Regions:
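Bacterial Sec-dependent N-terminal signal peptides
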Residues: 1-25, 139-152, 261
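Extracellular/lumenal carbohydrate-interaction signature centered on repeated Trp-anchored short motifs
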Residues: 29, 167-180, 231-238, 269, ...
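Short glycine/proline/serine/threonine-rich loop/turn segments at secondary-structure transition edges
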Residues: 113-124
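Extracellular glycan-interaction surfaces
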Residues: 149-158, 185-189, 208-265
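Extracellular glycan-recognition modules
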Residues: 152-216, 298-303
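Short hydrophobic/aromatic patches on beta-strands that form ligand-binding or substrate-lining surfaces
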Residues: 178-188, 242-244, 291-293, 322
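Flexible glycan-contacting loops in extracellular carbohydrate-active proteins
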Residues: 260-288, 312-319
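Extended recognition patches within non-cytosolic domains
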Residues: 290-344
Length: 344
């Protein structure tokens, strides 16, 4: 706001980071509060009332434009209030005092129970300015989509020994690209030949991985060598969300949504009897959850969109999914007879 204006020459818009219309809203288990700022383009000499309403169409457009799948949080699950905490209705709106150019709207979300709001669903609150006295609206900046980042408490699998978790997918032998994802906490990263995941009985080139605290992650495709490692150090005792994306004879390694390295290698393809094996006998009091296999090469934005929350098993292209949590009714894991037990 850098001037003064009357209704005929003033305009109203919703301020958001970088004016992109998106607000990331982090919720604790018992809920959370964030603020929106409707603004006037110029200072007004008289009070202005700005109406803000629920706008599912704005979320539908966001999902379509971004390939996202956020569901609208119902109006009954949140409240709007002014900066002092007085609850607002859509008809009342928020008041901008004379001589000012903005107001704060408090958005308050209570506890979202897992029965009504499953952890594998992503929610957003779509809000738009619907009117402001006789002022015009800036169409490209009238909406704010609040993307909810929820803190989810979940059980995980604790693993020691065994021969890894083996997944035999159906139909992958016809696919030229794929994505493997896993989430793990390693108690240490100095063990010899500690693998994250590998492909057994593949019909194309070799895919075998190792993980180390100093050299990062190795993608072995027929040979060893320093250049087969990402050379980015990793920490034990922290969640590592690891993603391998293979397409066009390239394998890209991501950790926690960030590219570590792109490896040039041969085509790595599945056979009809191929299995993905996650881990090996090197497990020592490590934690695992969220093992996923996709029959497509996920993009970086898709990887980050799906990174932390449980998935809907019906998600397109998700071929195999092991959430490894009691909440998702995963039972205790036992290794085959004759091998060391894998415990949960």
């Amino acid at each position: 706001a850098d001037g003064e204006g009357s209704g005929s020459e003033n305009a109203v818009y919703m301020e958001t980071p970088d004016n992109k219309g998106i607000v990331n809203f982090t919720l604790e288990p018992d809920g959370g509060i964030t603020y929106l700022t409707p603004r006037l383009a110029n200072i007004s000499q008289s009070p202005v009332t700005i109406q803000v309403g629920y706008d599912k169409e704005a979320l539908d457009k966001y999902n379509k434009d971004n390939g996202a799948s956020y569901e609208p949080l119902p109006p009954s699950a949140f409240k709007l209030a002014d900066a002092e905490g007085n609850e607002l209705s859509a008809s009342e709106g928020i008041r901008v005092p004379a001589g000012d150019f903005s107001a704060k709207i408090m958005v308050k979300v209570g506890q979202l129970n897992s029965k009504d709001f499953p952890a594998n669903k992503k929610y957003a609150i779509p809000l738009s300015i619907t009117g402001a006295s006789n002022y015009s609206l800036i169409p490209s900046q009238r909406s704010a989509i609040l993307l909810l980042n929820r803190s989810i408490l979940s059980s995980v699998a604790k693993v020691s020994g065994g021969e890894g978790i083996r997944i035999k997918p159906v139909g992958m032998h016809t696919k030229a690209e794929w994505t493997i994802q896993m989430s793990a906490i390693y108690s240490s990263l100095t063990r010899s030949n500690l693998t994250t995941a590998y492909l057994s009985n593949g019909t194309g080139g070799e895919f075998y991985t190792r993980i180390s605290s100093t050299a990062g992650i190795q993608v072995k495709n027929g040979r060893d060598g320093d250049d087969t490692w990402t050379q980015i150090p990793l920490q034990a005792g922290k969640w590592l969300h690891i993603t391998y994306v293979h397409k066009d004879k390239k394998t890209t390694v991501y950790v926690n949504g960030k590219v570590q390295k792109v490896f040039e290698n041969s085509a790595i393809t599945f056979g009809e009897n191929s299995m993905i094996v996650v881990g090996n006998s090197g497990y020592r009091n490590d934690y695992l959850r969220e093992i996923r296999l996709w029959d497509k090469a996920l993009t970086e934005s898709e990887i980050n969109d799906y990174l932390y929350l449980p998935m809907d098993p019906a998600t397109p292209h998700l071929v195999s999914y092991l959430p490894l949590s009691k909440e998702m009714e995963t039972k205790d894991l036992k290794a085959p007879a004759g091998t060391e037990n894998v415990t949960t």
